[in-house]
Each structure stands twice: as C-alpha cells, then as structure tokens.
C-alpha cells in the first residue's frame, strides 16, 4: 500500500471526513511494534460557524495545533481522562480538523489487546478514547505529522458510497444540528455513541 502524502489533505475538511474512511492509520511504537487500524468513523470540526470546535472563538495555547499545517496530529485530553485523536485538515492559519472516532484493528492486535485489557476485537478501537489507548497515543503526540516514520496513513480502497452513513456528531452540546459525522454502515467497529 502507498503512503498518503500532503496532497491528500488539500481537500476540504468536510470532504476529508468521507475520504479518510477505509484508509489505514499506522503507528510505529518506539520499540518497533507496528500498529494499524482502518478508519471507520470520523467527525469534522471547523473553527468558523461551529461552536463545538475548540477553536471557534480564537486561537489559544490549548488549540494552537489546530491552526498548523494539514496532516498534523491534534491530540487533546477530554474530561480529564481520555485522549482524542484529530487530524488537522484546513490550510495553515485556519482552524479545522477531523476527529477519528473509530477504527478496525488491522495489525498489532496482541499489543492493542494488552493495552486495552480485552481480547474482544470489536472493543479495541470502537470509540475515540479506545483507539488512542490501543495505539498508545497521548498528548505528547500532538503536533507531530503523518509524513514521518512514527505516524502515517496508507492508501486503501474507498468504501462504496452506499456504505457511507451521515449523521450529526456525538456527545456535543453546541452546533448539534450539523451533519458532520461519517461512518461505515457495515462495520461492527463503529462507536456506540448516539448522535447529539
């Protein structure tokens, strides 16, 4: 499979929520373990006209990574206990990102099972906090990009349009009406969260 380069991220954020589905997210751990997950669920967040976005008011120290170049990882700590993985998708200087909500485990499953303390494959990455735990992604990963040797995306066949579902986003209290969540209809690895 071919690595996806910077050109892939020139598409608009809302288009990337769909284009990222089916792609393979890869993390190489410091010990050399290869961890791979197929993206099956995404959500878009934009700095303008989206009150659910961390950067909708202004740039701060907390959200500054959202203003960096497309393909940069934005990892934040939610509710004081969960790391969530986003990929920056807007041109540098403009805030926007796609939250990776769920993946299907592809490689490195024993390592993921150990991290997650479960052998049930559908429970390994079926939620945004679960997948960061399985991959060992923490805030220290924020600001790194997908074009090096630790994190990258591999191209893979895109799902058929009929298999892609759209809904409002999960677990938000503002801008709840925006239909900016995409997921694969046939995947048992999609999160169980209900749209807002």
Swiss-Prot record:
It is an enzyme of class 3 (hydrolase). Keywords: DNA damage, DNA repair, Hydrolase. Gene3D superfamilies: Methylpurine-DNA glycosylase (MPG) (3.10.300.10). It holds the Pfam family Pur_DNA_glyco. SUPFAM superfamilies: FMT C-terminal domain-like. GO terms for biological process: base-excision repair. Its EC number is 3.2.2.-. GO terms for molecular function: alkylbase DNA N-glycosylase activity; DNA binding. The keyword Hydrolase applies. Belongs to the DNA glycosylase MPG family. This is Putative 3-methyladenine DNA glycosylase. It comes from Chlorobium luteolum (strain DSM 273 / BCRC 81028 / 2530) (Pelodictyon luteolum). The lineage of its organism: Bacteria, Pseudomonadati, Chlorobiota, Chlorobiia, Chlorobiales.
């Amino acid at each position: 499979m071919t690595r996806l380069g910077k050109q892939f991220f020139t598409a608009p954020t809302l288009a990337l929520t769909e284009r990222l589905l089916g792609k393979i997210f890869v993390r190489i751990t410091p010990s050399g373990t290869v961890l791979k997950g197929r993206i099956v669920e995404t959500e878009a967040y934009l700095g303008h006209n989206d009150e659910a976005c961390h950067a909708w008011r202004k740039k701060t120290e907390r959200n500054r990574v959202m203003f960096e170049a497309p393909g940069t990882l934005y990892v934040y700590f939610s509710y004081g206990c969960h790391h969530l993985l986003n990929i920056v998708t807007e041109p540098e200087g403009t805030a926007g990102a796609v939250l990776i909500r769920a993946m299907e485990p592809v490689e490195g499953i024993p390592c993921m099972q150990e991290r997650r303390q479960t052998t049930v494959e559908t429970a390994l990455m079926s939620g945004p906090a679960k997948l960061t735990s399985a991959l060992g992604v923490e805030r220290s990963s924020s600001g790194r990009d997908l074009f090096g040797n630790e994190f990258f995306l591999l191209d893979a066949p895109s799902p058929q349009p009929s298999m892609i579902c759209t809904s409002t986003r999960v677990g938000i209290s503002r801008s709840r009406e925006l239909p900016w969540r995409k997921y694969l209809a046939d995947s048992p690895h999609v999160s169980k969260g209900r749209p807002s």
